[in-house]
Structure formats: structure tokens, C-alpha cells
């Protein structure tokens, strides 16, 4: 499969029983694509001092893996209106990778941002809007967002998977 056809799902939850992980796994099987768990790339919290002395190899590896794809699907829970702190930290580190230019590690890539939440209030919408701006700043061409709200047991993800397919 050429880069032009490759999609990658980035799971931004570190919760073992994440409803977003259920959605990401269904997406993975439906799209026949790779899924990367950001929790497998956890590193110390970013600081300028740490960057100057010890840029994490894990982050360089992750950025290289991302750059092998043309379409990214971010699947995230909502934590107080934004993504989980550990995921924000990993993205912060990736923006500092000099190989692709500061804040440009997503340049030339297309993306879809998804959030699954049991709530019906505005937290999910807020995280999608903020992550859209945050990732666009790093060069991502955000094709759209998919909000799955009102999640409950035995939920049918199929209509939302179809939305993602139309966007990538």
C-alpha cells in the first residue's frame, strides 16, 4: 500500500476500558488500517531544559511512523474540555522534532478528529474544536470531526464509522 492510501488511527486515551478505544478498534477493523496507542509512547513532561539535553527517541520513532501515512484519525476522550494531559504532552514533544520543522510535523497530512462521550453536553464538541485548531497549527489538514455523544452499552458505531470513511 502506498503512502497515499495509508491511514493511521492515533488513540489518545490511556484508560484500559476506554469507550474511545472501542470505537478506534472498530474503525481499525472497518478501515483495515494501523492503530497506534499514544500511551505506549509516554515520556517525561516537556520542558525546554529537557529538550536541550534529552530529546526522547520514542518521540522521534512515533513521528517517523506518523509520516509513513497520509491520513490520520485521532480518537480522543474529553477531559475537562480537552484531550488527556499525557496525550497533550506527547503532541507537544512531537511539535519540537527538528526533522520536519518546528510545529510542522503534520504538514502534508490529512486528518479526522473523533471523540466518543457518554455525555450530551458540550464537552465533546469543545475538545473537537480545540484539537482541530491545535493540530492545524502543526500543519494537519483537518478534513472534519466526528462527535459520538450519548454513548451507552451496546452502542452502534457504524453510522459514525461511515462518517469517518467519507472524510478520509
From Swiss-Prot:
GO-annotated cellular components: cytosol
Example GO molecular function: oxidoreductase activity
Organism: Mycoplasma genitalium (strain ATCC 33530 / DSM 19775 / NCTC 10195 / G37)
Entry keyword set: ATP-binding, Nucleotide-binding
Residues engaged in binding ATP: 119-126
Top-rank taxon, per record: Bacteria
The protein's name in its UniProt record: Uncharacterized protein MG342
Pfam families, sorted: FMN_red (PF03358)
Cysteines joined through disulfide linkages: none
PANTHER family: CHROMATE REDUCTASE (PTHR30543), NAD(P)H-DEPENDENT FMN REDUCTASE LOT6 (PTHR30543:SF21)
